[in-house]
Structures are given as C-alpha cells and as structure tokens.
Curated annotation (Swiss-Prot):
The keyword Protein biosynthesis does not apply. A bacteriochlorophyll binds at residue 31. Residues 1-14 are cytoplasmic. One of its GO terms (molecular function) is electron transporter, transferring electrons within the cyclic electron transport pathway of photosynthesis activity. It comes from Rhodocyclus tenuis. It comes from the Bacteria. This is Light-harvesting polypeptide B-800/860 alpha chain. One of its GO terms (biological process) is photosynthesis, light reaction. The keyword Membrane applies. Its main location: membrane. Belongs to the antenna complex alpha subunit family.
Length: 69
C-alpha cells in the first residue's frame, strides 16, 4: 500500500478532517456553480408545482369468438 505512507508525514487526526472538509467544500462548490448556471434551477423551480402524470388506460380488445363449423 504505497498511499499509506502519507500517514507517516501527516497525522490521521489532522489529515482526515482536512480531507473530509475539502470533499464537502468541493461538493458545495460544484452544486453552487450548477445552480448559478441554471442547470439546477430549471427543474427545481417546477418541482413543487408539478402535476401528476396523466395515465390513459386503454381497454383490452374483446376476444374474437372462434367460428364453429
């Protein structure tokens, strides 16, 4: 495990919280940029007022009686 050598330089009690904070800030930044760009607002603004989908049910055709000879 070559990546495990980082903990010889940085203590896990310091490195793990910094890594988790970095991941959380990156996620907030990405979502913020998508929201400002309008990619999240386009469907989010319509979500609370969305109407249920209209489903049309078609009756099954009646079976055709077989001719008896």
């Amino acid at each position: 495990m070559t990546n495990g050598k980082i903990w010889l330089v940085v203590k896990p009690t310091v490195g793990l919280p910094i890594g988790m904070l970095f991941a959380a800030l990156l996620a907030v930044l990405i979502h913020g940029l998508l929201f400002v760009d309008g990619r999240l607002k386009s469907w989010w603004s319509e979500f609370p007022v969305a109407k249920p989908a209209v489903v049309s049910v078609q009756a099954a055709p009646a079976p055709v009686a077989a001719e008896v000879k």
